[in-house]
């Protein structure tokens, strides 16, 4: 035990010891019922971790530590989600490069030391190499932070979503989806990010409010009448394929089945009826364009309309006019739009409408919700592309209902989060697009045969053998072909796309557990016990993982989902790097306050509850950690064999028994909290007792504890102190792992994190299981139950302290007389603790008087 207790440097000391001793190493020889397995969220490797990561990962770690102390063999791996768009963007910004797949590989390429003014184009292979190199550096920094925070993961179980095993499992799962008809290739309207030039799934959308204008356009009916249509996107007028109104809208019922002519381009389009048209929006009749939004897609599909694409994948209008625009004047008008961005094309289209007299009135300002890719900075467009899909219930009510039922089998913490899952499933508008037109990801494991003219046959994909996985079709050759046949007539071509990162991270239980590559391990850990994650990715990670497990195993991937809330800034706004209000780095917090203090703040946030970022809470946590060390030093100063091997049978004094009985209730409450995933409740009840223990019990028992160890009353104090300390250190251990390990090491063998979770019987149980801790000592001839003696003694001591404080006297000043008035039972109870109260309060004389009132102390200072 050090001469002076200190928190400085204990993280480095104990992290090293835990690693050397294999404290958290998973033992795969145990059976499934002995295992508690956790599907740890693999953080996205796209820069630095933020305080939200520290917050939520601490919650899962507290649960892992509790389960380990309860006797479970905890399977707690760590993964890195190191492929996909966020990683690519990180590499682009870090090095100042841009991937150009048309460029040849440069084996001697060295990235710029400083990002150039304009991105430097490099080959795909060079770009992927940069991605791999930078993610390794980032992952080392991530691991260092997690170790400093005290995550009790088994680092030998670490995986990365781009490593060979993960890629093989991801490709294998996709091919099995394909074999069962759950994956398919289709040409369809696709949400498209024009900056990243890739498809985007529904789960990755984000609505952002933007200021726009309604433009009133004049169409002409077949009878020559004007039909006013209001739109916020006049630049899509050349893509117009129909007008639509509600079937009950009497203003337009006479027009259904007829045609109208578009302004400027003079293209006839049908006038249709559809129940999704909104009579109270604008003029009540809308133009259907291919494609302005998802409603256009729905109308186009259900009304069997033609396609007139105008928007290119680069976000600019296509160079050639769409079908239908044929006369010279219309073609000339379109030429003025070709090649312009959507923003510029809108301004030009308004000019054309004004010039033709087809713009009625002035544009009217409006606020509108515009869809963005959650990581993008330009509005999404909808373009027709060939993409791979996985069926997710978006177009299948039966599958959707099955996934709702599956969600109801899952235990949700907190329970109300289930409604978010169900709302998402019920609102699915289409199947899941899993292909991405990017570079650093898991390749789609498919080739296509080329016919004699060199055109791909998408109906007959070439698939790899299972034993060959993982494959990269861009460099690997399919069975039966030679690489010289690549891109040659009669040869083959690779699918150029990679999978959405969620397509791989939706398989984290399978990847961590070794599905198809380590059947023994997988059988011991799957289905997993816990999925901890943030609530905002229920729609992506949680749902996708549920879907893949449902398709592959027809069961849940885990038993419980633990959802964490957001971290809020002082203005009650979510803290995030994108908002610019998350400037404090986790490592700086850990350095300033200590890991246990930061964990204390994190565990103060209940599941699913948004929590304020509060360094004040961290200061309280640090004070608590220091107090734990000081309280331990106080208890261990008593040289007594009883301290080393305490037993409840050694506890004979009523005050000591009362304290242990109260602590036994805390053990029960803390245990219930953890089993219900309410770690905050466990912390609160333990901390509340601890401060009372330090402020009241230690003061009350101090004088007696310094007595002769041969005195049974002194031995009782020593045993009670040791039992309480041993229990408190274990109760705090899941939340405050470093300080509890430090204090434990001063007087106990092994690690506190491998010690058993405290049980009530350790504190109050007799051999026959009878709880006698809160009863009058049987040597006094009574079995009458006594109310909380510790509370009674603490109340009298508090009155004595208050009297001294008001008189501005030292707490060691003597009390000439303590007079107690109260009922006979209360006075008898006080007699059992009188010795300790008198010693703690420095009381010379005590008088008692029976009265039908609550116990009332009167203090006469000396």
Curated annotation (Swiss-Prot):
Pfam families for this protein: Anticodon_1, tRNA-synt_1
Domain of life: Bacteria
Species of origin: Salinispora arenicola (strain CNS-205)
'HIGH' region, short sequence motif: residues: 43-53
Keyword Cytoplasm: yes
Catalysed reactions, as listed in the record: tRNA(Val) + L-valine + ATP = L-valyl-tRNA(Val) + AMP + diphosphate
GO cellular component term, pick one: cytosol
Keyword list, A-Z: Aminoacyl-tRNA synthetase, ATP-binding, Cytoplasm, Ligase, Nucleotide-binding, Protein biosynthesis
Protein name: Valine--tRNA ligase
Subunit structure: Monomer.
Family named by the database record: Belongs to the class-I aminoacyl-tRNA synthetase family. ValS type 2 subfamily.
């Amino acid at each position: 035990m050090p001469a002076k207790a200190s928190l400085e440097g204990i993280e480095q000391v104990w992290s090293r010891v835990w690693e050397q001793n294999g404290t958290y190493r998973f033992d795969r020889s145990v059976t499934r019922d002995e295992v508690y397995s956790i599907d740890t969220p693999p953080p996205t490797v796209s820069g630095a971790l933020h305080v939200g990561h520290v917050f939520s990962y601490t919650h899962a770690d507290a649960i892992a530590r509790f389960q380990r102390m309860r006797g479970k063999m905890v399977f707690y791996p760590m993964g890195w989600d190191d492929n996909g768009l966020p990683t690519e963007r990180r590499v682009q910004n870090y090095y100042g490069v841009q991937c150009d797949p048309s460029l040849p590989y440069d084996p001697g390429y060295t990235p710029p030391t400083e990002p150039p003014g304009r991105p430097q184009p490099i080959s795909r292979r060079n770009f992927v190499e940069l991605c791999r190199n930078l993610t390794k550096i980032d992952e080392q920094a991530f691991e260092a932070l997690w170790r400093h925070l005290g995550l009790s993961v088994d680092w030998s179980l670490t995986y990365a979503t781009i490593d060979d095993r993960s890629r093989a499992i991801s490709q294998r799962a996709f091919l099995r989806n394909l074999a069962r008809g759950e994956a398919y290739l289709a040409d369809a309207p696709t949400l498209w990010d024009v900056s990243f030039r890739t498809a985007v799934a529904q789960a990755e959308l984000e609505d952002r409010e933007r200021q726009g204008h309604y433009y009133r356009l004049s169409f002409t009916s077949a009878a020559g009448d004007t039909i006013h249509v209001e739109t916020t996107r006049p630049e899509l007028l050349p893509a117009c394929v129909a007008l639509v109104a509600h079937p009950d809208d009497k203003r337009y019922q006479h027009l259904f089945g007829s045609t109208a002519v578009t302004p400027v381009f003079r293209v006839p389009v049908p006038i249709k009826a559809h129940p999704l048209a909104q009579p109270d929006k604008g003029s009540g009749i809308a133009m259907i364009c291919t494609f302005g939004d998802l409603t256009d897609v729905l109308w186009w599909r259900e009304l069997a309309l033609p396609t007139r694409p105008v928007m290119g994948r680069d976000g600019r209008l296509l160079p050639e006019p769409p079908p239908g625009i044929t006369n010279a004047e219309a073609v000339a008008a379109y030429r003025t739009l070709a090649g312009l961005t959507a923003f510029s094309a809108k301004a030009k289209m308004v000019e054309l409408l004004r010039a033709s007299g087809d713009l009625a009135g002035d544009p009217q300002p409006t606020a509108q919700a515009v869809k963005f890719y959650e990581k993008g900075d330009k509005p999404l467009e909808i373009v027709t592309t060939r993409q791979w899909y996985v069926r997710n219930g978006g177009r299948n009510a039966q599958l959707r209902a099955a996934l709702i039922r599956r969600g109801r089998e899952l235990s949700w913490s907190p329970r109300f989060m289930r409604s978010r899952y169900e709302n998402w499933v019920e609102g699915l508008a289409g199947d899941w697009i899993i292909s991405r037109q990017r570079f650093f990801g898991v390749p789609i494991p498919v080739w296509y045969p080329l016919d004699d003219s060199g055109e791909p046959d998408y109906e007959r994909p070439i698939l790899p053998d299972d034993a060959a996985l993982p494959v990269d079709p861009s460099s690997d050759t399919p069975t039966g072909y030679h690489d010289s046949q690549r891109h040659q007539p009669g040869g083959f071509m690779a699918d150029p796309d990679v999978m959405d990162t969620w397509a791989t991270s939706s398989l984290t239980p399978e990847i961590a557990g070794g599905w198809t590559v380590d059947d023994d391990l997988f059988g011991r850990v799957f289905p997993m016990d816990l999925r901890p994650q943030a609530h905002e990715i229920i729609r992506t990670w949680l749902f996708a993982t549920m879907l893949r497990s449902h398709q592959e195993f027809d069961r849940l991937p885990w038993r419980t989902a633990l959802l964490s809330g957001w971290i809020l800034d002082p203005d009650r706004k979510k803290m995030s790097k994108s908002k610019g209000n998350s400037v404090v780095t986790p490592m700086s917090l850990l350095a300033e306050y200590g890991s246990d203090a930061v964990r204390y703040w994190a565990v103060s946030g209940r599941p699913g509850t948004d929590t304020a970022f509060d360094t004040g809470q961290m200061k309280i946590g640090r004070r608590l950690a220091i107090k734990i060390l000081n309280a331990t030093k106080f208890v261990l100063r008593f040289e007594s064999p009883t301290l080393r091997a305490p037993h409840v049978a050694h506890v004979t004094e009523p005050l000591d028994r009362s304290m242990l009985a109260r602590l036994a209730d805390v053990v029960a409450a803390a245990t219930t909290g953890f089993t219900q995933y309410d770690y905050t409740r466990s912390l609160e009840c333990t901390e509340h007792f601890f401060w009372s223990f330090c402020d009241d019990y230690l003061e009350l028992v101090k004088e007696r504890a310094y007595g002769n160890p041969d005195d049974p009353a002194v031995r009782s104090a020593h045993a009670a102190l040791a039992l309480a300390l041993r229990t408190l250190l274990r109760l705090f251990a899941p939340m405050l792992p470093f300080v509890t390990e430090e204090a434990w090491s001063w007087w106990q063998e092994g690690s506190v994190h491998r010690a058993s979770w405290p049980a009530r019987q350790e504190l109050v149980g007799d051999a026959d299981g009878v709880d006698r801790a809160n009863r009058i000592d049987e040597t006094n001839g009574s079995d009458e139950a006594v109310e909380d003696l510790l509370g009674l003694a603490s109340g009298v001591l508090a009155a004595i302290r208050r009297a001294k404080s008001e008189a501005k006297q030292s707490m060691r000043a003597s009390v000439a007389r303590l007079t107690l008035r109260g009922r006979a039972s209360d006075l008898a109870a006080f007699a059992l603790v009188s010795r300790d109260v008198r010693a703690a309060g420095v009381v010379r004389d005590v008088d008692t008087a029976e009265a039908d009132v609550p116990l009332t102390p009167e203090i006469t200072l000396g």
